[in-house]
Amino acid sequence: MGISKLAHYSIRTTDLEASRRFYTDVMNFRVGFRPPFDFPGLWLYFDGDESEYGVVHLIGIDPDDPGRLVRYLGERSADGMTGTGSVDHLAFLATDWPKMRERCDAHKVAYRQRTVPSLGLHQVFIIDPSGLTVELNYPAREGSS
């Protein structure tokens, strides 16, 4: 049996609410079903599709009771709690860059962009509240709009 696709990525965060706002208000994900784990968190979905398991899992770190999370997912160094660590970035295919640009501007989210003609892509890079770089790949024609 081979690997067929990326199921989700998880972000440990000390500010669950800031991460929720970023992924729902800027990235346009939706909070959906999450099992009743014994630690704070949210599962985020595209387009209301809950047929799978969410694409982003936000894992809240409770500074008053970190043991619940450690028991479930294991210990992590506080040094690795921001940025992407050894992962450079995560990327999504996307459409409607003008609408996303409006959301970024409205929420004061900085972005870097470039068009890569040989790939037919307009790439936009944004940083989430935990310092994770997210790449959004739009059709190249959207880069001029």
Where are the predicted features?
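Core segments of cupin and vicinal oxygen chelate
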Residues: 12-61
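Vicinal oxygen chelate
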Residues: 2, 92, 98-145
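Exposed loop/turn and edge beta-strand positions of beta-sandwich/beta-sheet ligand-binding modules
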Residues: 5, 38-40, 86, 120
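Active-site/binding-pocket entry motifs
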Residues: 50, 64-65, 142
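Short hydrophobic/aromatic beta-strand micro-patches
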Residues: 10-12, 45, 91-93, 127
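Conserved catalytic-core motifs of GNAT/GCN5-like acyltransferases
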Residues: 10, 30-37, 114-117, 141-144
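N-terminal beta-strand motif that seeds the catalytic metal site of vicinal oxygen chelate
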Residues: 1-20, 87-90, 140-145
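Short, flexible, mixed-charge acidic loops at enzyme active sites
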Residues: 66-77
